């Protein structure tokens, strides 16, 4: 009896265990993995559409796509775009194996519509991408199939722009960019690439637009734009491409020749920019300490603001230190009676952009500024510091000790590091902590030869805009040693503070420590400015090309890059464009090679500015694409087989 019960229990346990294993295998099957079998690497397959893909005379506004497995649509708002553009965003819903797109705008008669999903469609379990997919239909008798493709780059640094709209207008006058939505539209990917599909034969102009308000037209200076004067005539021809079938990562099986239709143009280059004269507004005014307050603006202006003091004369009591474009301005109070006030009351008139018209206008605001640290608090802190010093002196006196420590007081401070060595073509700069006058008789530049120091000629120049910044110009010679000496009280501020004595030794590096670079630019004219870059944002040197050359001397050894731009207005800086004036941003070029410069070496390079398209000019090290994971299938089964072979070989070695 016990034997029967035992055998019966074992039989049932065995069945239950087998069922559990089957269940675990079934649960593990989706996607499989190490090591429940091969991975699922098959992308989703489209089984059918309603209306039929490529259908004609379609009137319904609901589109249904059915796939062979459950799917997902990734970042639909960013990746999916309907052309002609829809002012009211279409609704995209996913349910299992089905995608439903509802077009909410009325359909235009006799028009080809495309729904470009880019690479957004993936299977729901493993995320295998379907690849770039576009659904299309026509509301008329004809389906337009032409395509226009290219890239969009930032005009100032040739960085590919992701997510900007690129559109076509069949009306060729400039005004349509501001007054009408695009006829056809696409959106760029992370590489700045776009492909506008469903284009009918005809003549077009192309535009790019970072559409801030969703109306598919250029609305204002805050929107990044690009435009081309070229008239585009789409065309096509039969072509072939070659597809290599690989056995593994090293060996290939065969090369297939695949016929396809080649659409032109396929290499448009649009350089996008924000217009010069961006909307200007007063961002904030801050008064952290009694002595000064600072105004911050969102954009530069050629016109400096004015202060109309309430209860004081701004013209005689304020000193102004500003940036070159008047976007940051600091006002120093030099009247001691004004400093003692807790509240500074004034009217401030400045140039701003009118919200309704977008035009520059003068605006006046009234302010009452109270410093975070009031003068009363400042005086209390000084009194407390003096009291501590006096007590310390008293303790030292009682111990019979003397002290050389001076009583606490405010001094004019120097900032700006003077390097121990300097190139012969550089100069010394320093910044003072507060507005001051300088007695140059108390400043000495000493040339040291052996152990003898002699006065060397120099020139001290205050900055044109920043009244705290100074430059010391000298007759520097390679290999020489100097000492800059500033006597005590040579600097006296508007608050009657003086400087402590200051000295700094430095040397002029010998020629052997530097590299030189000579760049031959056959297409250069007098408008070309060539920049030597230490990084994308750091301009090390800048010269204007002369006689087809740009020469750089006294370069510290290191890695560098070259950028150039056409300085048409001769202001030594890159300038943006203006659409209404038909003015493009100044053209930028990059030298495609990275330069490794060594000490005591002269390097010569020849640079043909237009030898490469913009997409291939920028050195790899400077390319700063917003890397998004490319939606391509992974060969995980190949990886799995390699891992299994690796483990097998390991077991054989151990055995």
What are the residue ranges of the model-derived segments?
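N-terminal targeting or signal-anchor segments and their processing/structural boundaries
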Residues: 2-655
